[in-house]
């Protein structure tokens, strides 16, 4: 019995010296350090964040540098995130172009609304067309890369259609007549195509630096904007006193 009592004391002493198992569980877990690329986004924000990242990549690196992986890196998210939201690069470019067309249309409408005379509204809208392209050359390039876009996407279809409606209104103002976008006469269609060809062609030549030679032959100080103004005025009657 004495031996048993001694053994019991040893067992009790060992038990008192052991740390409870739950004490280990209470130790704080070591957290992984967040890298700069692990930017957290709320569920509803990631789509917009990816589009903004795509805009930055486009303006900085051009269309050639705009890839799904580049956008993911810029946004600080996984490489799979852009694919999940847009499907492929065509999907991303299409959503980006939709944003461009909306901004483009807003700029033309704002410029036109600042004028009172119909002809001046048309001239102001045309100048806003060129100014937008100069301010956002990368976005403008995407908007008119039809082969890279999916016009079956509602956002792009609606935005581009609204921009065309704005162009139609500008031509209608210069002609001082009502034009139905759904039903055009041949003469009206020709007027729209002529105006669009002039402004878009001028814009592309300007962005590519192809107008430098012409501008160098004009009186010193003549700007591209003045050249555009002279071109536009040949297409519309000049209001009295202007």
Task: Tell what function each PLM region has.
Residues 134-152, 204-212:
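Amphipathic alpha-helical segments used for helix-helix packing
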Residues 173, 195-214, 231-241:
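Amphipathic C-terminal alpha-helical segment
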Residues 95, 109-139, 160-161, 185-195:
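Hydrophobic alpha-helical connector segments
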Residues 53-61, 103-114, 198-205:
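Solvent-exposed, amphipathic alpha-helical segments
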Residues 108, 151-179, 189-193, 221-236:
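Amphipathic alpha-helical packing segments from all-alpha helical-bundle domains
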Residues 49, 53, 57-91, 95:
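Helix-turn-helix
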Residues 1-45, 56, 239-242:
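N-terminal intrinsically disordered/low-complexity leader segments
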Residues 58, 93-100, 143, 159:
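Alpha-helical DNA-contacting segments of helix-turn-helix folds
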